[in-house]
Structure formats: structure tokens, C-alpha cells
């Protein structure tokens, strides 16, 4: 990485556990990266894994002041690296989805009048009506989610109208009525980021707004009925003022950078601020993702993303407007129990293994056991498959409380059997393959209506599987991804996979400011994107016999989920 004399663009990624700032040049070369890890780098916040928790009510939230501290630190780090801020032409960002920030009536004045001699943390806390932001792992809103479902008649109808299902504003105005009354504007985490750089409360992004359950996707406007439910006594017009208008162009210039940053860091006064999007929409912008390509983000959560022209909402999935391209949608599956659940199994294997754990690779025992276990955990070709659900936190898909379930499944029309049992299981050894398979089987089950055959005689599946996030470094997990999900062209890793959100945000800024009239993101970025530099094939994809075995496993997995759900309701 080195300096560049041409225009530069910054993409920020404000995720659950860290803030990253990534700088690219016009030709998409990464020239600087800075990051701030909340657990190890923040001072004065009693957090764990980036959040505070109230276990009694299932609340998970983050102190907004910590994010301000992180932004101060990341900008200072970029300065120390030698970034010439005067060359930065545009800024965009990515924010963890479903989190909200509450501004008070002094916010505009404070944002617009920051003192260049002081930090953001010292000045902006006074602009908030509530000091915390709910996190996507929060499970305190089940009552509110159920009300949203019932309000439009069913969860299927809510999914059809809004692209997904459920939100925190309804709970916030009930639990903190005084803070809600003092709230003049509400931001998502993404628009909060943009607001700081803009020096004014920024509008929502056309894609990220779809995660609020208030945006009518077929009509592309606020849904008046859902606003009424969410607004409480103050009424829908008051809530609409707090939410603001939403520009439909994901590349629109919102304005120039706040004078605070020009004074403190020597940004050029003409540096443009563009809409910041959600972390998941930003991830699909980290490469020109084509329809039928799938991206799997293996981070704290497990997330499956596809770009598709088809709008086929379902209560267990999320659809969003594409962050840059009208006429395309982003399909998303998001699971709370991703990396944290895999880590629990890893730790159990390390604790019981006779092998010494390599401190430089704590996954070595897990990977070895995973690869030694045959697909489906079948000891013999005709033996039962081992299946499980591993939820250390309450899960969204399926909607279940925390717990762990183990099943044996024998496929076949004549002798099919599904049985909840630990018979034949060796814990935690068998859990390694079972947990990885369970996460990928759920993805295959829920994406099957959106994939089709990539070539004659080949069963429906993605064309390519791209892995991003921390788990993308794990070759054993990548191998199982290809076995379960297919991918006729194989499984690939983005070589900056852990920086995918920040990279997508930076690309979005490049496109917003350098596009020709009507030029799409896919066209501009596709012309500059060098696949051989950014992508590495790390595993085989479609293998006919194993893919067929997992087709049978999907049937058992679906039945297992239904049985556990039915028992949970009793």
C-alpha cells in the first residue's frame, strides 16, 4: 500500500466489533486501511464483543460515544499513515443494519458548529436524545415484531410490503417516552456515519431503509399504516419528520464535507459526502456481483447475499432495494448464530483434545476434526445423517430461543426416519461438521427458489460462491460450503474479504462521483475491477454425488426445523 497522487475515496465500515476506514484510488487500488477494535482499543466502556447486554430483557446495545471515539482514532491513524486528506474526493460508509441513533433538537446546530480543536467524542454526545444504539443481536422486540405481523394481517404480507419482517422504534417510544419526545431525528447507523461527515443529519440510503419495516418496497415510499403503528400517540406525521425523506439515487451527492474535518484533518472543502448504506448491501458492492453469484459473509453473524431481479419476499428472508442499481434487489438471509456459535464448538474441541492448541491457529483442531468427519456425519454410507441446531443466542431464522438440538436422519422414501437423539454422536467431535453443515443447509434450503440451473443438466445452484468475513480464511469451512451449496465455478475468497464492507462503501463513493450519466455501478466498477488481483479460488464447488447427498439432507433439515419449532410452541 502506498500513496496516490490522483483522487482518493474513503469507505468506512461501522460494524458490531470494530470501525474500519479504507482508502482507494480511482482505479480501485487500496492505499490505506485503519481499524479500531472496540473491545481492545476503546477506553471507558464496559463492553464485550462490541456491545452491552441486558440479559433480563434480551437487549443488546452499543454506546454511541464509543463509535465517536473510534472515528476520532481511525482518522488519526490514517493521518499517521501519511494519508493526504486533501486528495479525498468522496466519502461513503457502511453501517451495521437495524441499529438506530436518536438525535435531539440541538443536533443540527451541534453537528454544524463543531470545534476543530476538539474531538468528536467530546462534542457530539450532547446532540443525542438517547446514548445507546440497539444492536442487530437484540431479541427484546418479539412483542413488537408480532404486532407488525398482525397489523398487516400476516407475516407474509408484511414481508411482501416491506421486504422483511420487524423494528426498534416502536419499542423505543414505549420504553423511553421522554427520550422519544426529545428526539428530533432518527438515523440508522449508516446515515449516522454520513451525518457526522456532512455536518447535518443525513437522509437514509435507499437500500438500508428497507431494513426498517416502514418502507413500502413495491411503492418505494413510507408505508402510512406501519408509520401509524410505530408512531404511538405522537402520530405518523411526527414520526415521518423524525425519519426524513429518502433519495432514490444511491449515488446522490448529499453535500460537501463539514468544515470541522477540513480544519482538523485538511480535507478539501469540496470533498463530497454520498449516502452510506447498510453493511450487507455494502458487501455486495465489494465486487461487481452478478445475478446467480452468491456471497456468504462468515462474520459474527452468518449472512447469505444475492443480487437478483426477482422480488420474492418471504418471512424468513430480507429483500432490499439494491444500493446502487434500480431494478435489482438484494436478497439476504441473516443468522445471529454465526461465528460465535462456531467458536463455542471450536473451544469445546480444544478443551477436550489431546492435541496441543496452536496459539497462532486456534482453529487447527476444529478443522482437522471437521475434515475427518464424512459428509452428513455418516459413519457408513447407509447410516443415519447427524444433524443439529446450535443457537447460543436466540435465533431469527428459524425463530427459536437459545438451545442445542441433535438429530439422526435416515433419508429414503421407504425407510425415512428423523429422530431427536444423541445416539451415535461423539460430542464435541461430531459437532464440528454438524454446525458448519447446519448453517450451510439452512442457506441452501432458503435460497432454492432464487437459483436456477447454470448450465444444461446441472441442478439449480449458484454460479459462484464468494466467501467474505473472518471465516473466509478457513479452508475447511470453505470446502464444506462448496459441498453443500454447490457453485458450478467453485468457491472463491475476496482477498480483502474481511474488509468487504469498507471496500464496497469506497467503491460506492468512486461510482457516485466518477460515473457517466446513467452509468451503472456494475458497468463502472466492472471495467476497473481486476478479478485476478481481488479473487482467489479456495475450494471446489459442485460435486454431483455429494451435492445430491446434501439435497436429501436439506429435506431432513427442513423437517428437523419444523419439529423443533412445533415443540417450542407447545
UniProtKB/Swiss-Prot annotation:
Signal peptide (from-to): none
Enzyme Commission designation: 2.7.1.17
GO terms, molecular function: ATP binding; D-xylulokinase activity
Residues binding substrate: 98, 279-280
Enzyme class per UniProt: transferase
Pfam families: FGGY_C (PF02782)
Subcellular location: Cytoplasm
Gene3D superfamilies reported for this sequence: 3.30.420.40
Key word Metal-binding present: no
Predominant subcellular localization, coarse grouping: cytoplasm
Function: Highly specific D-xylulose kinase which participates in the catabolism of xylose. Xylose is a major component of hemicelluloses such as xylan. Most fungi utilize D-xylose via three enzymatic reactions, xylose reductase (XR), xylitol dehydrogenase (XDH), and xylulokinase, to form xylulose 5-phosphate, which enters pentose phosphate pathway.
Protein name in UniProt: Probable D-xylulose kinase A
Name of the gene this protein is made from: xkiA
Amino acid at each position: 500500500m502506498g500513496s496516490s497522487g490522483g483522487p482518493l475515496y474513503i469507505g468506512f465500515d461501522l460494524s458490531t466489533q470494530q470501525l474500519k476506514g479504507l482508502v482507494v484510488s480511482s482505479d480501485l487500488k487500496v492505499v490505506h486501511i485503519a481499524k479500531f477494535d472496540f473491545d481492545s482499543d476503546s477506553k471507558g466502556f464496559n463492553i464485550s464483543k462490541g456491545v452491552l447486554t441486558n440479559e433480563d430483557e434480551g437487549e443488546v446495545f452499543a454506546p454511541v460515544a464509543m463509535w465517536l471515539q473510534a472515528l476520532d482514532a481511525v482518522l488519526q491513524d490514517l493521518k499517521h499513515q501519511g494519508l493526504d486528506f486533501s486528495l479525498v474526493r468522496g466519502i461513503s460508509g457502511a453501517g451495521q443494519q437495524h441499529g438506530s441513533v436518536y438525535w435531539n433538537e440541538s443536533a443540527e446546530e451541534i453537528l454544524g458548529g463543531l470545534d476543530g480543536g476538539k474531538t468528536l467524542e467530546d462534542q457530539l454526545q450532547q446532540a443525542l436524545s438517547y446514548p445507546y444504539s440497539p444492536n442487530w443481536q437484540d431479541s427484546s422486540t418479539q412483542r413488537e415484531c408480532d404486532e407488525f405481523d398482525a397489523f398487516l394481517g400476516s407475516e407474509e404480507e408484511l414481508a411482501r410490503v416491506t421486504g422483511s419482517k420487524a423494528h426498534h422504534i416502536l419499542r423505543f417510544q414505549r420504553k423511553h417516552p421522554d427520550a422519544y419526545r426529545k428526539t428530533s431525528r432518527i438515523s440508522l447507523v449508516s446515515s449516522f456515519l454520513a451525518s457526522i461527515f456532512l455536518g447535518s443529519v443525513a437522509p437514509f440510503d435507499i437500500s438500508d431503509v428497507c431494513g426498517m419495516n416502514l418502507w413500502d418496497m413495491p411503492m418505494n415510499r413510507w408505508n402510512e399504516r406501519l408509520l401509524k403503528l410505530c408512531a404511538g400517540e405522537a402520530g405518523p406525521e411526527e414520526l415521518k419528520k423524525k425519519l426524513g425523506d429518502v433519495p432514490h439515487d444511491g449515488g446522490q451527492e448529499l453535500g460537501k464535507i463539514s468544515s470541522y474535518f477540513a480544519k482538523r484533518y485538511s480535507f478539501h472543502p469540496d470533498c463530497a459526502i454520498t449516502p452510506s448504506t447498510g453493511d450487507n448491501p455494502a458487501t455486495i458492492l465489494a465486487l461487481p456481483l452478478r445475478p446467480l453469484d452468491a456471497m456468504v459473509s462468515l462474520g459474527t453473524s452468518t449472512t447469505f447475499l444475492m443480487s437478483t431481479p426477482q422480488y420474492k419476499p418471504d418471512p424468513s428472508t430480507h429483500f432490499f432495494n439494491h444500493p446502487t442499481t434500480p431494478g435489482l434487489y438484494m436478497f439476504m438471509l441473516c443468522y445471529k448464530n454465526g461465528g460465535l456459535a462456531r467458536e463455542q464448538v471450536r473451544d469445546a474441541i480444544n478443551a477436550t483434545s489431546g492435541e496441543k492448541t496452536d496459539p497462532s491457529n486456534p482453529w487447527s483442531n476444529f478443522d482437522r476434526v471437521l475434515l475427518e468427519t464424512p459428509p452428513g456425519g455418516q459413519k457408513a454410507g447407509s447410516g443415519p445423517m447427524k444433524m443439529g441446531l446450535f443457537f447460543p443466542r436466540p435465533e431469527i431464522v428459524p425463530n427459536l430461543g437459545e438451545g442445542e438440538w441433535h438429530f439422526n436422519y435416515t433419508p429414503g422414501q421407504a425407510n425415512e426416519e428423523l429422530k431427536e437423539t444423541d445416539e451415535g454422536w461423539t460430542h464435541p467431535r461430531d459437532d464440528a461438521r454438524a454446525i458448519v453443515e447446519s448453517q450451510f443447509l439452512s442457506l441452501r434450503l432458503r435460497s432454492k427458489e432464487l437459483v436456477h440451473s447454470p448450465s444444461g443438466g446441472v441442478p439449480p445452484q449458484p454460479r459462484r460462491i464468494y466467501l467474505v468475513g473472518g471465516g473466509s480464511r478457513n479452508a475447511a469451512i470453505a470446502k464444506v460450503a462448496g459441498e453443500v451449496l454447490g457453485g458450478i465455478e467453485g468457491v472463491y475468497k475476496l482477498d480483502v474479504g474481511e474488509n468487504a464492507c469498507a471496500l464496497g462503501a469506497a467503491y460506492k463513493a468512486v461510482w457516485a462521483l466518477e460515473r457517466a450519466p446513467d452509468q451503472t455501478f456494475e458497468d463502472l466498477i466492472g471495467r476497473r475491477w481486476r478479478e485476478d488481483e481481488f479473487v482467489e479460488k479456495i475450494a471446489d464447488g459442485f460435486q454431483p454425488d455429494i451435492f445430491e447427498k446434501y439435497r436429501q439432507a436439506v429435506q431432513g433439515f427442513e423437517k428437523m426445523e419444523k419439529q423443533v419449532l412445533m415443540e417450542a410452541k407447545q
